[in-house]
């Protein structure tokens, strides 16, 4: 018996990946960073591979090594690498590494020497996000250093990549500008004498809306889990996560009763209150106070009063509600329950954050569609 749970439909992940894979001639990297966007990195990775993913993408070296320890042999790219990490462990495990500066490249050269095999690198160019990646002015120097290291046998340049700013806003001119910069960067790669097998730029949004940005490899993340990166468009994706809890306690209160800390909510009539054992320690944003949608007893309700660390309250009015009844915070939406998109809109964030925070807390995570 569970008090609260996050339930993940692995068949939904398989279905989403299969559909995404069928829509492009490019190979597909399923991004499973952030504990698989809260869905569980290893189960999500295995389901994505079942669905046809060719690659897995993660941020950290630890994430990549965890996948290897779990017996996953598919190609893995890790790209958020601070100085001083034991990169030789990644090289020895056959993990591809993202490089965005000569300093990073130098560390990877040393890692290749220590591991006794070339470090497989994906060189990243900053096409406009101003985050990771070499600037356009630094790009030629990185290419020159990479070409020399490859000639020395300490690295192998496997890929060249970048990341979009506005792909979730189809038609935004920045996307076209970034694509042009990426093409210019690829021309420089060729002039430097490098011939990487993979050129990749497309995130979920570009995978869905910009086939001209698919190149050799696409990198969907959010879409793998059935959520759309483009507002107002579902693309037929199937959400994989449901968050729910059982009613812990019900009580009758009179009209005018203040509810939860600060009494920011007051009952307008005699009402039944339902106490739900989930709070901000479990991923419920405190900003969901008086705004978060919850489905209980066949009715979509709104959190009444402030979200506490471990619980929140619903004003159920005259509706019959009892301890043990199931309150669904979000799911696929097929049965009238809110979705992660509804939650994102209610609290002023994005669906990425909703599933990642709910799935990475003390709430037990369970799975449908597990395979031996």
From Swiss-Prot:
CC terms in the record's Gene Ontology section: cytosol
Origin: domain of life: Bacteria
A Pfam family matched in the record: Ala_racemase_C
GO molecular function: alanine racemase activity; pyridoxal phosphate binding
Keyword flag Isomerase: yes
GO biological process: D-alanine biosynthetic process; peptidoglycan biosynthetic process
Residue numbers carrying N6-(pyridoxal phosphate)lysine: 33
Active site per the UniProt annotation: 33 (proton acceptor), 261 (proton acceptor)
Reaction equations catalysed: L-alanine = D-alanine
Pathway(s) this gene product operates in, as recorded in its UniProt entry: Amino-acid biosynthesis; D-alanine biosynthesis; D-alanine from L-alanine: step 1/1
SUPFAM superfamilies the UniProt entry points to: Alanine racemase C-terminal domain-like (SSF50621), PLP-binding barrel (SSF51419)
Residues involved in substrate binding: 131, 309
Signal peptide: none
Enzyme category, top tier: isomerase
UniProt keywords, alphabetically: Isomerase, Pyridoxal phosphate
Keyword match Isomerase: yes
Catalytic activity, EC: 5.1.1.1
Family named by the database record: Belongs to the alanine racemase family.
Biological function: Catalyzes the interconversion of L-alanine and D-alanine. May also act on other amino acids.
PANTHER family: ALANINE RACEMASE, ALANINE RACEMASE, CATABOLIC-RELATED
Protein name (record): Alanine racemase
The species this protein was found in: Salinispora arenicola (strain CNS-205)
Gene responsible for this protein: alr
């Amino acid at each position: 018996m569970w008090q609260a749970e996050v339930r993940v439909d692995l068949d939904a992940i398989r279905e989403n990946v299969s559909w995404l894979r069928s829509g492009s001639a490019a190979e597909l990297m399923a991004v499973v960073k952030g504990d698989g966007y809260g869905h569980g990195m290893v189960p999500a990775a295995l389901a994505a591979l079942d669905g046809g993913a060719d690659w897995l993408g993660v941020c950290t070296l630890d994430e990549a090594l965890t996948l290897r320890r779990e017996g996953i042999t598919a190609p893995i790219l890790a790209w958020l690498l601070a100085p001083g990490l034991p990169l030789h462990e990644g090289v020895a495990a056959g993990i591809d590494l993202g490089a965005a500066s000569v300093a990073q490249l130098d560390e990877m050269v040393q890692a290749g020497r220590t591991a006794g095999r070339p470090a497989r690198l994906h060189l990243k160019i900053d096409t406009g996000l101003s985050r990771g990646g070499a600037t356009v002015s630094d790009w030629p120097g990185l290419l020159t250093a990479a070409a020399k290291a490859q000639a020395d046998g300490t690295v192998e340049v496997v890929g060249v990549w970048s990341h979009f700013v506005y792909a979730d806003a189809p038609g935004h001119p920045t996307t076209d500008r970034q694509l042009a910069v990426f093409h210019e960067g690829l021309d420089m790669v060729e002039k430097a004498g490098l011939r990487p097998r993979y050129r990749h730029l497309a995130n979920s949004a570009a995978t869905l809306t910009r086939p001209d940005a698919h190149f050799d490899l696409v990198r969907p993340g959010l879409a793998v889990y059935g959520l759309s990166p483009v507002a107002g468009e579902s693309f037929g994706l199937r959400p994989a996560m449901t968050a729910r809890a059982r009613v812990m306690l019900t009580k009758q209160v009179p009209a005018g009763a203040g509810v939860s800390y600060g009494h920011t909510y007051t009952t307008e009539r005699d009402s039944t209150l339902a106490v739900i054992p989930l709070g901000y320690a479990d991923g419920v944003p405190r900003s969901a106070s008086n705004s978060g949608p919850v489905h209980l007893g066949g009715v979509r309700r709104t959190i009444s009063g402030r979200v506490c660390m471990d619980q929140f309250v619903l004003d159920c009015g005259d509706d019959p509600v009892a301890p043990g009844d199931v309150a669904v915070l979000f799911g696929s939406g097929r049965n009238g329950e809110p979705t992660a998109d509804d939650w994102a809109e209610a609290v002023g964030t994005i669906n990425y954050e909703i599933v990642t925070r709910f799935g990475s807390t003390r709430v037990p995570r369970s799975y449908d569609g597990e395979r031996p």
